[in-house]
Amino acid sequence: MAKKLFMFEKPLGMRDTLPFLYELKKQVRSVMAEEIERWGYEFIETPTLEYYETVGAASAIADHRLFKLLDQQGHTLVLRPDMTAPIARVAASRLYDDGNPLRLAYNANVFRAQQREGGRPAEFEQIGVELIGDGTVTADAEVISLMVALLKRTGLGRFSVAVGHIGYVNALFLEILGNEERASVLRRFLYEKNYVGYREHVKSWPLSSIDQKRLLDLLSLRGGTDVIEQAKTLVTSEKGRRAADELAVLMAVLRTYGVAEAVKLDMALVSHMSYYTGILFEVYAEQVGFPIGNGGRYDDLLAKFSRPAPATGFGLRVDRLIEAIGETDVRDDIECIVFSQERLAEAVELAEAKRAEGKRVVLQHIAGIRDIDAYSQRYRSIVYLLGRSGRDGQ
């Protein structure tokens, strides 16, 4: 009974990819990979399984969302929950050997356990880049500009990139709150976009009216470069002001790249990825309720693999990007050759000739078809090779 119950079911959060969606993903993946390589990034693959003690611990994904298992030697393994930590491992151990910038890219599935009521995929495809070894703001601008270029190449119409700086938020919170516990509470509200909860908590704490106003004013710091000077008035520390200055430099470089019109500053932007140390960003499309991609600077991550190096990068969610793109043309050019046994050799020869021309061709024996009318609707055209002498038809 239990076997029948689960016969057509999938584990929680797992999804099938049917032919139409697979073809659409392939097209999107292809144009993005081509653009990434044009920018000089090299693709890399890492194992699906990693050690929990290394990549699992270095990942910013919460422990309860990791898929864990034991190997035969008793080591705890995890299905990779993101690609940044595995690439940091590879770079630290094998590739980042001379201290010069390293540009890597990836296209892979990642795995994150979901709650039953969450309704989100536990396995999803990401495509992205990591720029390792360059600590300049220009490097941050490069990966943001590349991300914008990728989205334009896919045909995505309207999207916006929100950019912030975790160093600014942390500096402001430390100045006013004085401890990490309170700061983490407010960061969680900001990540969840729960601004009502944020305001209520700020007002419930015994803070001066000036400090309350500073924390509340943070929520209004969104827009163009004019918010940078406003942001600097809320902080007194050098760290906070330096973070704001980095955003000013970033916007200037993005204007040089010609992508500044797609970018808006959001000084209250934070991420659930705890390894971000500086500039961070998210990209949104009107048709999707969640970010379709995110990224930022993570200068401390490679140190966990005993190879300190600055780094920045981003990842795009292919499933959400497909949803944002919406209706699009997918290749529907498969031809079919239906043949009887007497015409097998002729059918094979014709199929091979068409395939050599780059066409997609199905070769189908007439005896294997139950409903010829329904079957013929699947293909752009059908060639019939039937009977001993036969008669060709379209």
From Swiss-Prot:
Give the pathway listed in the UniProt entry for this protein. Answer: Amino-acid biosynthesis; L-histidine biosynthesis; L-histidine from 5-phospho-alpha-D-ribose 1-diphosphate: step 1/9
Signal peptide positions (record):
none
Q: What is the predominant subcellular site recorded for this chain?
A: cytoplasm
Could you list this entry's UniProt keywords, alphabetically sorted: Amino-acid biosynthesis, Cytoplasm, Histidine biosynthesis
Which subcellular locations apply to this protein? Answer: Cytoplasm
Q: What else is known?
A: This function is generally fulfilled by the C-terminal part of HisG, which is missing in some bacteria such as this one.
- Subunit architecture: Heteromultimer composed of HisG and HisZ subunits.
Q: Which family does it belong to?
A: Belongs to the class-II aminoacyl-tRNA synthetase family. HisZ subfamily.
Q: What is this protein called?
A: ATP phosphoribosyltransferase regulatory subunit
